[in-house]
């Protein structure tokens, strides 16, 4: 089946999201718990409940705790002025990092957050003292789950994989689909339904990047 739109690569695992990517747009809408460190003029009506100082000109007072979408929290965050501080979502805190380090494969990552790796990478934008631990946890979690994901994608031809896929975050689902497509292409070639085996898109993109680096 053809895709409904031309897929755009996510930038969430890098320093900034790619707002031409639907996955990044959805990820940037996920809520992040924050604490207001500097009163914000005329924002009380937007964020406070009715009757709690929500007049049009009422400021958002210092110490207010609320949840903001990631894109807004990043826009308001300032290292020098300290407009707001960010509280780590529970799945990135030390307790869950310990669980991931013990056996990341037992965790339903999609339930924890459909954009677990992308959202976690964007948390590094904020000056948490736990940033180094978060980045290491994300990397080790990905490595710990990668082999099982790819093994499953290569050994489930014409099988129901819905239970497995339901536990994967969106990045992992993309990898699983790549593995499934490669398996299906190989099976088609083996049955004589394809004229030749071609390099995967990952290999082709790697060669392009390598050639570009050589030119530079």
UniProtKB/Swiss-Prot annotation:
Pfam families attached to this UniProt entry: PSF3_N, Sld5
CDD domains: GINS_A_psf3, GINS_B_Psf3
Keywords: Chromosome, DNA replication, Nucleus
UniProt KW Nucleus keyword: yes
Not essential for folding and stability of GINS complex, but may regulate accessibility to the central complex pore: annotated span: 1-16
Keyword Ribosomal protein recorded: no
Biological processes annotated in GO: cellular senescence; DNA replication; multicellular organism growth
InterPro entries: GINS_A, GINS_bundle-like_dom_sf, GINS_Psf3, GINS_Psf3_sf, PSF3_N
GO CC, one annotated term: GINS complex
Cell compartments where the protein resides: Nucleus; Chromosome
Subunit structure as annotated in this protein's UniProt entry: Component of the GINS complex which is a heterotetramer of GINS1, GINS2, GINS3 and GINS4. Forms a stable subcomplex with GINS2. GINS complex interacts with DNA primase in vitro. Component of the CMG helicase complex, a hexameric ring of related MCM2-7 subunits stabilized by CDC45 and the tetrameric GINS complex.
PANTHER family for this protein: DNA REPLICATION COMPLEX GINS PROTEIN PSF3
Record family assignment: Belongs to the GINS3/PSF3 family.
Function: Required for correct functioning of the GINS complex, a complex that plays an essential role in the initiation of DNA replication, and progression of DNA replication forks. GINS complex is a core component of CDC45-MCM-GINS (CMG) helicase, the molecular machine that unwinds template DNA during replication, and around which the replisome is built.
Protein name: DNA replication complex GINS protein PSF3
Native source organism of the sequence: Mus musculus (Mouse)
């Amino acid at each position: 089946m053809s895709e409904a739109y031309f897929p755009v690569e996510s930038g969430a695992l890098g320093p900034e999201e790619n707002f031409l990517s639907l996955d990044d747009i959805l990820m940037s809408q996920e809520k992040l718990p924050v604490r207001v460190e500097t009163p914000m003029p005329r924002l009380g009506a937007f964020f406070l409940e009715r009757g709690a100082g929500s007049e049009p000109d009422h400021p958002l007072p210092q110490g207010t705790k609320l949840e903001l979408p990631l894109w807004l929290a990043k826009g308001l965050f300032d290292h020098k002025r300290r407009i707001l501080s960010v509280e780590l979502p529970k799945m990135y805190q030390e307790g869950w990092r310990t669980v991931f380090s013990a056996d990341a494969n037992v965790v339903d990552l999609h339930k924890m957050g459909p954009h677990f790796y992308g959202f976690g990478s964007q948390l590094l934008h904020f000056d948490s003292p736990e940033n180094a631990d978060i980045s290491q946890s994300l990397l080790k979690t990905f490595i710990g789950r990668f082999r099982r994901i790819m093994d499953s994608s290569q050994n489930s031809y014409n099988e129901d994989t819905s239970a497995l896929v339901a536990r994967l975050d969106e990045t992992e689902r993309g990898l699983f689909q790549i593995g499934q497509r490669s398996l299906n292409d190989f099976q088609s070639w083996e049955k004589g339904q394809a004229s030749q085996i071609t390099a995967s898109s990952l290999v082709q993109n790697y060669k392009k990047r390598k050639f570009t680096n050589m030119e530079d």
